[in-house]
A protein has these predicted regions:
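Acidic, surface-exposed loops and disordered segments
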Residues: 1-173
Length: 173
């Protein structure tokens, strides 16, 4: 099988991480892969916020947990959180941001880094705390939180992949 296709098929969500920080060059490659995701009309609506600061990461984790009303770390101990947001003025913003997340997760797997998509970014950045984070970075505009790509080195083997469901694909010949 083609190496790239195998990378896509072999990727799994990682839900237990070592505390070790990723080297900057590895993180930068993952982020760069995200910036080259396909996007509607080439408008590049998404933005990526790379969080490696533990205090900020932990505060965002608490905010995310409060949205789902659960006393857990929704980021599973991952040391890096990449938040993807997208400009609401662009009609394809959610799709574009989703492709950014997918590219980053595939790149992470190719580099031996675990990843998982975590939801509730939309709700986070509708709250005052989320808006304040954007303001502190000088980010202006009307952005919607699309998702989080958490990253780190896996502390356990991923779960085996589930078989694909029947009737996943239909061909019209």
């Amino acid at each position: 099988m083609n190496e790239f296709v195998n990378t896509l098929i072999a990727r799994r969500s990682t839900k237990k991480y070592k505390p070790d920080m990723l080297p900057k060059d590895v993180l930068d490659q993952i982020i760069e892969a995200g910036t080259y995701a396909a996007n509607g009309r080439g408008l590049q609506a998404p933005i990526i916020i790379a969080i490696t600061n533990k205090e900020i990461r932990d505060n965002l984790s608490k905010l995310n947990a409060s949205i789902m009303n659960a006393p857990i770390d929704p980021f599973y101990g991952a040391p890096v959180v990449l938040v993807v947001l997208a400009d609401k003025k662009v009609p394809t913003c959610v799709y574009d941001g989703s492709l950014v997340l997918g590219n980053m997760m595939a790149a992470a797997h190719a580099l031996g880094v675990g990843s998982c998509w975590i939801h509730r970014a939309k709700e986070e950045f509708e709250l005052p705390e989320g808006k304040e984070l954007l303001k502190s970075l000088g980010i202006e505009g009307d952005y919607e939180g699309i998702g989080h790509c958490i990253l780190g080195y896996p502390a356990a083997d991923p779960a085996p992949r589930a078989p694909r469901k029947e009737n996943y694909v239909y061909y019209l010949d």
